[in-house]
Amino acid sequence: HKINSFVGLM
């Protein structure tokens, strides 16, 4: 998921 990727980046 895009959201999951975003959280991983953080």
Swiss-Prot record:
GO terms for biological process: neuropeptide signaling pathway. The keyword Disulfide bond does not apply. InterPro entries: Tachy_Neuro_lke_CS. Keywords: Amidation, Neuropeptide, Secreted. PROSITE patterns: TACHYKININ (PS00267). It is found in: Secreted. The modification Methionine amide is found at M10. GO terms for cellular component: extracellular region. The keyword Acetylation does not apply. Tachykinins are active peptides which excite neurons, evoke behavioral responses, are potent vasodilators and secretagogues, and contract (directly or indirectly) many smooth muscles. Belongs to the tachykinin family. This is Neurokinin-A. It comes from Gadus morhua.
